[in-house]
């Protein structure tokens, strides 16, 4: 993945949070970074050292044009970081189906669109890497965040299937699985989607636990460092579980009976 200009990488959702920290770190390590944003002008003001591309991962034409522009400017693509996403809060019963579809349109189908457009260039590279940013919630679903958790579980399956599909090629795939991370992503989560919920205090307690956990969580730089390792290590891991809490939960999921694991989740979130 070496060249005079350094390897080229496309990072989706690069204007804030994990994406911004990743784009900054990769640029500092010599990567030619193409960052996507729905508002590239504002993103350029924050980080002029990144080559910004307008892209809405929900739109086929926008994704196609964004990937094309990156290839036109660099001539190749050595790595892809699929990071664009957001969260919603509310019960399975009360979140409108249209809102649930929108969650998957960004988190799941958005990732799929970018992968499909970038794959031919990645397969043509001498050695290429893909990092898909999932979440611990994909393996330990959060009460009243079922839609977000399910979208991340879908990315978990996507990353593992893609790893096997590309195993005979020169492309390596890693799933990045962070726990709670303190970013602007959390501010963008719609906690007031469902007002006057039938679940009352239980939903309120779950929200309070989430907000307290996020307030004391590590910053996005810890995830950016894991992504850097996935893109530069000779034999990258299939899964990078990021953060002490995430590693503990991953261990518990592996060894505890499922019923006990669900009970611990209920106790933690006060539901």
Whereabouts are the PLM-identified features?
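Conserved glycine-rich cofactor-binding loop
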Residues: 15-16
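Rossmann-fold cofactor-recognition segment
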Residues: 47-61
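Substrate-binding pocket helix/loop in short-chain dehydrogenase/reductase
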Residues: 91-92, 96-101
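Active-site loop immediately N-terminal to the catalytic Tyr-X3-Lys motif
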Residues: 93, 140-146
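Active-site helix of classical SDR
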Residues: 115, 151-154
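Residue(s) in the substrate-gating loop at a strand-loop-helix junction
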Residues: 135
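C-terminal beta-strand-loop-alpha-helix "lid" module of Rossmann-like NAD(P)-dependent dehydrogenases
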Residues: 165-214
């Amino acid at each position: 993945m070496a060249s005079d200009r350094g390897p080229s990488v496309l990072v989706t959702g690069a204007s804030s949070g994990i994406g911004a920290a990743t784009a900054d770190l990769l640029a500092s390590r010599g990567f030619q970074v193409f960052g996507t944003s729905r508002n590239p002008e504002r993103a350029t003001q924050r980080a002029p050292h990144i080559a910004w591309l307008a892209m809405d991962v929900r739109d086929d034409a926008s994704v196609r044009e964004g990937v094309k522009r990156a290839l036109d400017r660099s001539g190749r693509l050595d790595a892809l970081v699929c990071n664009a996403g957001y969260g919603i809060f509310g019960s399975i019963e009360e979140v409108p189906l249209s809102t649930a579809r929108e969650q998957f349109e960004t988190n799941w189908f958005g990732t799929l669109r970018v992968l499909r457009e970038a794959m031919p260039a990645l397969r043509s590279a001498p050695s290429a890497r893909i990092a898909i940013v999932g979440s611990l919630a994909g393996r330990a679903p959060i009460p009243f965040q079922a839609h977000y958790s399910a979208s991340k579980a879908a990315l978990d399956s996507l990353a593992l299937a893609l790893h096997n599909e590309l195993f005979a090629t020169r492309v390596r795939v890693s799933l990045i699985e962070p726990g709670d991370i303190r970013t602007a992503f959390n501010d963008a989560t719609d906690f007031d989607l469902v007002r006057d919920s039938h679940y009352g205090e239980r939903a309120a307690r779950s929200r309070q636990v989430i907000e307290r956990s996020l307030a004391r969580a590590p910053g996005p730089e810890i995830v950016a460092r894991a992504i850097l390792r996935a893109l530069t290590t000779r034999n990258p891991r299939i899964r990078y579980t990021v953060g002490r809490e995430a590693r503990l939960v991953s261990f518990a999921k592996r060894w505890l009976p499922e019923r006990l694991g669900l009970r611990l989740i209920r106790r933690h979130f006060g539901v």
